[in-house]
Amino acid sequence: QPDAVVFAGDIYDRSVPPVEAVALFDDFMTQLRAALPNGEIMLISGNHDSAQRLDVFRSELSDRGIHMIGNPPMQKGETIERVTLTDDFGAVNFYLLPFVRPGMVRLVTGTKENGDNLSYPEAFSRLLALSPLNPDERNVLVSHQFFLPDGGDAENIERAENEVKQVGNLDAIPASLIADFDYGALGH
């Protein structure tokens, strides 16, 4: 039996899903919890989800081992949500970082000197710096961004039909920014 189940977004395919989709997800989560009564369930929002809707009951669900994270850190003092599991080899830290747009996190990451939002890589890098990793433990990033291998050409990456392509692929984040993690559970 697994110790955890991780969903790296999207939960739904649109920000306001149909009632049937919400009911289906509710049924799925009920069955998953029944099948995994003592395991941790971790979910983050993706670019198609409504982060605010997924954050409803966040604290209550977390107390029950269901970590459904809609919004990234958006206020000063907030950090990336971390869930720590332990096994015979020590701690495994899961850092739950939902889909991020630089404007969403400007109160946490700051802005450029002229007041403009940071680039996607700059904002993402500053968010990661909020939660320093312990190199003596295993660290897993759960994220839903558009990562590219260093030197990769975003023009050659196929995207889903309903996915908005940023002009010049400004949303691309170099994979080197997550090199300190032992594993990346990356959604899309």
What residue spans do the PLM features occupy?
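Extended recognition/assembly regions associated with phosphoester-bond processing machinery
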Residues: Q1-F7, I11-L186
